[in-house]
Amino acid sequence: MRYVIITGTSQGLGEAIATQLLEESTTVISISRRENKELTKLAEQYNSNCIFHSLDLQDVHNLETNFKEIISSIKEDNVSSIHLINNAGTVAPMKPIEKAESEQFITNVHINLLAPMILTSTFMKHTKEWKVDKRVINISSGAGKNPYFGWGAYCTTKAGVNMFTQCVATEEVEKEYPVKIVAFAPGVVDTNMQAQIRETAKEDFTNLDRFIALKEEGKLLSPEYVAKAIRNLLETEEFPQGEVIRIDE
């Protein structure tokens, strides 16, 4: 049985990924602040299994313990492959550094960087000896490579995700049962995060007009299109180990 653990499944890209996997009779471990009832209905429709866990990714001091309880329920005997998709993220604060509050920085770092690091580490510890296909996909962003006015925290944490991914891949080189890991930048996706970006004051985000134009011109990628690309990463034999890739690369 294939297991896929996904964070941030209540809406947007995480929901689209979970939907496509459930249609393939995958067991999805859904982690978000609130349960997505539509995923539960879909699992019943396709005779799949969607197991929801409410987990506060900001609570980094208890995250390993809480995630360990979740992943410990999965036994190697029942697994043909196991994958982790660190999808949950936040772009806030969307304003120049001098305007942002310290608590906003802390929240951004906890959700975007520390949570993926802790979840990946716990995942690797639990599956260390498992002789199955193990993969981690960290959802990154082009902002991890390019600076944006008003996105100091987001750019910084996504750059951290990229480097973390590369470091883990380096550490897995000599392993007998290595974890495959990649950072994936999905492009500009038509989700609630993009709606939030378009509502930002222009003095706080100087690229605002570009993002509004992408929406008006129909150039945003659909969550379903991006989810398909991520699903392909879970299945391909030519896995881009340790790379930071953009969609369609």
Curated annotation (Swiss-Prot):
Q: What's its top-level EC category?
A: oxidoreductase
Q: How is its activity regulated?
A: Inhibited by Cibacron blue 3GA, a general SDR family inhibitor.
Protein's cellular compartments: Cytoplasm
Single biological process term from Gene Ontology: tetrahydrobiopterin biosynthetic process
- What is known about this protein's pH dependence? Optimum pH is 6.0-8.0.
EC no. given is 1.1.1.320
The UniProt record gives the binding positions of NADP(+) as I6, N87, Y154, K158, V189, T191
Q: What is this protein called?
A: Benzil reductase ((S)-benzoin forming)
- What species is this protein from? Bacillus cereus
What is this organism's lineage? Bacteria, Bacillati, Bacillota, Bacilli, Bacillales
